[in-house]
Design a protein with these regions (language model features):
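Phosphate/pyrophosphate-binding loop motifs in nucleotide- or prenyl diphosphate-using proteins
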Residues: 1-182
Length: 182
């Protein structure tokens, strides 16, 4: 099978179900942003491979898989309903449990953190901000077509996960968090 089809050469693409839409369609923007997030999540997992972060790497690999499902759900067009499994409640519950565990182990802060101090911390914040952009794109898509609510919930939780993972990396590497002091 060839990687190119020439079907998109005139600025249109097919959604799951066969519907043809412009490549600037809000659904294409949403699933494209999730695809970008998946790539950054993989990079973050690769950067965390080692003896200090085995659980986090495992979590990130599971998140990558869920993000593929999220992207597929955002790519469903006319005739594609029911062709993609949904994001499970368990996936969101897992995120919430991971968030709670990280938060319990971290010192409380009352100021915003500024990304930096370590490449892995910065990459956590890149993932967080791309996730927020993906969530906004999914919300725009939801205004025009059907987007499963679990997609929106998952993306919302996921950005919190990346924030706390950044703080966790700082804590475990003894990197001082950079706090914003206006």
């Amino acid at each position: 099978m060839k990687i190119y089809t020439k079907g998109g050469d005139k600025g249109h693409t097919s959604l799951i179900g066969g519907e043809r839409v412009p490549k600037y369609d809000c659904r294409v923007e949403a699933y494209g942003t999730v695809d970008e997030l998946t790539a950054f999540t993989a990079l973050l997992a690769d950067k965390l491979v080692g003896d200090r972060f085995p659980k986090s790497v495992g979590q990130l690999r599971r998140i990558e898989s869920q993000l593929m499902t999220v992207a597929a759900l955002l790519a469903v067009g006319e005739g594609g309903q029911g062709k993609v499994a949904s994001v499970s409640d368990e996936a969101t519950t897992d995120l919430e449990q991971w968030i709670d565990r990280m938060q319990e182990r971290l010192p409380a802060i009352t100021k915003f953190t500024i990304p930096g101090g370590d490449e892995r911390i910065s990459l956590c914040h890149v993932c967080r901000t791309v996730c927020r952009r993906a969530e906004r794109a999914a919300l725009r898509a939801a205004e025009q077509c059907e987007v499963p609510s679990e997609v929106l919930v998952y993306l919302n939780r996921l950005s919190d996960y990346f924030y706390l993972l950044g703080r966790t990396v700082a804590d475990r590497t003894s990197t001082e968090e950079i706090l914003w002091i206006p």
